[in-house]
């Protein structure tokens, strides 16, 4: 006689850490839809020359896959330093650069080294939602304070809370995700003057910003400032999973204490180096995306939506009567955007022109419904 199959265990059946119970994993919806504007990728695919270079580079590396990779990724860090020197105008050496599997691993290593039990991290919300998740995962106390009306950073309020709470880690995202504003070097200097620990300036969208990179301040604040970046956004290398940081060499020495051995594969290293060799071609799309972002913003404003001025490759817009319902209405029309959890607002990545047109047509239809702001109008669709 066949016994009944045992029920599959659930999380409740496992000896999970108590602080993880009831939590949900991070992640944007992955759905097969005609228009995907929800994860802020560069919509322009790699050039054939870049594809060929990656294939050749990986093929050459494959003969040594029986060996561990360069654990310190010196060649890749040298190429990243050369790129940053050209892009920011600040001379950077490989000893100032560290790389990992996406900027999230970089952030995790930073919190492992400078956060932890008995230590505190502060963020100004709404901002990148992985900052509190990584803080929780490293047992760093997370403290958040609201941004100003309009979602900008109130630097005076930020200085006050940092001076009062004396955190070990401060997060500033510039341009800020999901709201889009950059922070000036003058404002960062004011904050750095009072930060007791380290200030992490998250420049994931730095190539889109109208403000200079904070890497120019590292020499002035070597023990307080670290700048994190990624190749997942402007660099159109999201599938390659490569993040990096710029800091004084001593800070990188600290990360060597917590990094996993051989954390960055040979394949990732050579593929990223190939992408860097084609940086000029890839980043040529940045100006196009900025122009499209401005076109989309103007059209949305013309329909009556409130559009938050953006310095990145996305726009935050509202004010919807019911943002989750509006998100579903976009999805029903084949357009996937992001509900970032801000009441009344949704975020849309800047895509290719035809993708943006499809998004604007869907927006015009929603502007004529009871989900839209009171002042919204369908006028202005392409």
UniProtKB/Swiss-Prot annotation:
Disulfide bonds: none
Catalytic reaction(s) noted: L-histidinol phosphate + 2-oxoglutarate = 3-(imidazol-4-yl)-2-oxopropyl phosphate + L-glutamate
Organism this protein belongs to: Mycobacterium marinum (strain ATCC BAA-535 / M)
UniProt record, GO biological process: L-histidine biosynthetic process
Self-association state and partner proteins as the record states: Homodimer.
First-tier enzyme category under EC: transferase
Keyword Transferase tagged: yes
NCBIfam families, per database record: hisC, PRK03317.1
Domain of life, source organism: Bacteria
Cofactors required: pyridoxal 5'-phosphate
GO molecular function: histidinol-phosphate transaminase activity; pyridoxal phosphate binding
Protein's UniProt keywords contain Amino-acid biosynthesis: yes
Modified residues (N6-(pyridoxal phosphate)lysine): 233
Ranges of Basic and acidic residues composition bias in the record: 9-22
Name the UniProt record assigns to this protein: Histidinol-phosphate aminotransferase
Region (Disordered): 1-28
Keywords: Amino-acid biosynthesis, Aminotransferase, Histidine biosynthesis, Pyridoxal phosphate, Transferase
Family under the similarity heading: Belongs to the class-II pyridoxal-phosphate-dependent aminotransferase family. Histidinol-phosphate aminotransferase subfamily.
Pfam family, one: Aminotran_1_2
PROSITE patterns named in the record: AA_TRANSFER_CLASS_2
SUPFAM superfamilies given in the database record: PLP-dependent transferases
Upper lineage: Bacteria, Bacillati, Actinomycetota, Actinomycetes, Mycobacteriales
Residue spans crossing the bilayer: none
EC number: 2.6.1.9
Functional pathway: Amino-acid biosynthesis; L-histidine biosynthesis; L-histidine from 5-phospho-alpha-D-ribose 1-diphosphate: step 7/9
Secretion signal span: none
